[in-house]
Amino acid sequence: MKLNISYPATGCQKLIEVDDEKKLRPFYDKRISAELSADCLGDEWKGYVVRISGGNDKQGFPMKQGVLTATRVRLLLDKNHSCYRPRRTGERKRKSVRGCIVDSNLSVLSLVIIKKGEQDIPGLTDKTIPRRLGPKRASKIRKLFNLSKEDDVRQYVVRRPLPERDGKKAKSKAPKIQRLVTPVVLQRKRARMALKKKRVTKKREDHAEYTKLLAQRMKEAKERKMERKRSNSRSKGDSIRESTSKK
């Protein structure tokens, strides 16, 4: 079985092949996320503590967290599950995955070092690989370099050197800083707030004008109604007087 061991503190990882079954026996029947000592791998691993993070069997099927079996099963997976990437929106598919329990049928077991031991492991803990990309958000850059709000973040952005071309000057590349507060940003914010106040004022004026017009229309309608009532009562009185005069 091969062991893919990574050390996040240095950014390194190493693939070692272990043929001795006795060295691998402590890993058997352990689940993903289980932590155990790596002393069984040899004297140079004394004091190291590793966490099981996953693995693949001999046919290439991955281990899946939460499947409490040591064998292979077929599960109906969607976009919220690991071990499957849907090609269409809402697509589900039945895929073969291996359970989260380690056994001898695995070809690769992934381990993460969570505690360093006494000795350095060549190619794993004795060198550091710098991160290729630095933080992009302004608040993350401030946190990384312990800056205050008055400091200019643009001077501290992590630049990435580009490979040199023959006969040309060496260049570097920097990411666009997100959420950076500049005078232009503040000006846009003031413009947005002014536009919002203008809309509120216009809406209030329109509402007052509409209320005034509605009251005027209701008053006119009421006057017309009263006028109709008066005219109806007047015509009714005239007809009564005409009928009495004929008699």
Swiss-Prot record:
Residues 217-247 have a biased composition (Basic and acidic residues). Residues 194-247 are annotated as: Disordered. One of its GO terms (cellular component) is ribosome. InterPro entries: Ribosomal_eS6 (IPR001377), Ribosomal_eS6-like (IPR014401), Ribosomal_eS6_CS (IPR018282). Keywords: Phosphoprotein, Ribonucleoprotein, Ribosomal protein. One of its GO terms (biological process) is translation. Belongs to the eukaryotic ribosomal protein eS6 family. Component of the 40S small ribosomal subunit. Plays an important role in controlling cell growth and proliferation through the selective translation of particular classes of mRNA. This is Small ribosomal subunit protein eS6. It comes from Aplysia californica. The gene is RPS6.
